[in-house]
Amino acid sequence: MTRYEMAQIVAKAMAKGASVERLAAEFADELDNLGVRVANLEKKADNVKVTGEVRFRYVDQDGAMSRRTLDRGYRVLGNDSNHVADIRSRIWINGMINDDWTYTGMLQNVQNLNNNAGDENTSFQRAYVDGKLGGMAVRAGRYNLVIADGNIYDTRADGLELSYGNKVKVKGFAGKATDDITVVPFMINDGINTETGDITNGGKYWGLAVEGELAKGLKATAGYTQFKDMGTGSVAFDNGNFDKTDIDNGIWHAGLSYDMGHFNLSAMYLKGDLSADKLNDRSDGNINKAIDKYLDDDGFVIGLAYKGAKAEDAGSWGAWAKYYDQGAQTYVAHTTDANTFGMTGFKGFGVGANYTLAKNIVANVAYYNTESKLMKELPGIAADLDRTKDHRFWTDVTFTF
């Protein structure tokens, strides 16, 4: 047989192979029912994965409130109760770019069940890539940034994160913090009117952290994070605009975590150095002196946890307890579901438990009792800014698919 004749046979086989591939794609479901795997289709299908979760939440909140009286004094009105009920739906999209890089996106919808107004919002909350450059892990885009186990920051950010190492990991990160957080409550009084609200500009950030295992079950972490230009801009007021406080803060943290069988004991110390470049009222006072006088610059968190519910394991459960005593200069967007009173300092505790009702259905319950640390120093002013004390009972059920 000549090479030309052999080429003709190969050409015919290739043509038939292309036809077979087209037929396999057309009848993929039927072939799958017959137990015939279509490898190429499976490989392509694995490139993109769509998952989701739906969380039903109810929170009952009870806190002491104070309000200004006509003679500009303050009085406690007693307990003011309210509740939050909502449904949060999330759709996750994970795609394989190549062997080293992946893409993750997340679309979120939240429906407010407190009224019949149809309040809801939908937004693209995550869009980032993960990959490797040499021996370095890279994450870039809009993702959930966690700093100091969430005791400093735990919410979305637009940024870049680099990490290197295995048993000892060194991490660097920088970017823009979300504006969807209460950096600090404010109160403006011009002698006639008083206006309160929240300053929400998260500013920019950069930081370094190192974490590793010191011994079996004993892990340590330490780091430094710098936040810049938080709360920039101005506040519209009846008699003009007032500059918002341009806040910078550098926060150190160091923590230990120890596994004891099914238990985990953790502790973390934090220290901040907050400063402001502008005034947030018309006085000529030095706001940095006020910061040093009234806003604590250090704090700590102690936690104890037992096991934990796993979505894939029906009947699994866990419990936890934490105590917080964090000054205003030690956090920006805290991970806790308790009331942290903006960025003004808080102390208190939280306890909770979680249980997997059925595969991919997890229930959570928690109780939080916190109070404002600023209230201890400025009982009149702090009362106008936010709750002085807060008790909340949190429940939710999350379905994943």
Feature roles, as predicted:
Residues 1-55, 60-70, 75:
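N-terminal periplasmic/intermembrane-space "pro-region" immediately following the signal or transit peptide
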Residues 2, 57, 64-82, 115-119, ...:
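Outer-membrane beta-barrel pore domains
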Residues 3, 53-56, 78-190, 200-223, ...:
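Outer membrane beta-barrel
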Residues 17-24, 38, 42, 98, ...:
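Short, structured coil/loop segments at alpha-helix boundaries
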Residues 31-38, 142, 300-304, 344-345:
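Short amphipathic alpha-helical surface micro-motifs
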Residues 183-197, 282-287:
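Low-complexity, polar-biased intrinsically disordered regions enriched in Pro/Ser/Thr/Gly
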Residues 197-198, 243:
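Alpha-helix capping and helix-loop boundary segments enriched in small/acidic/polar residues
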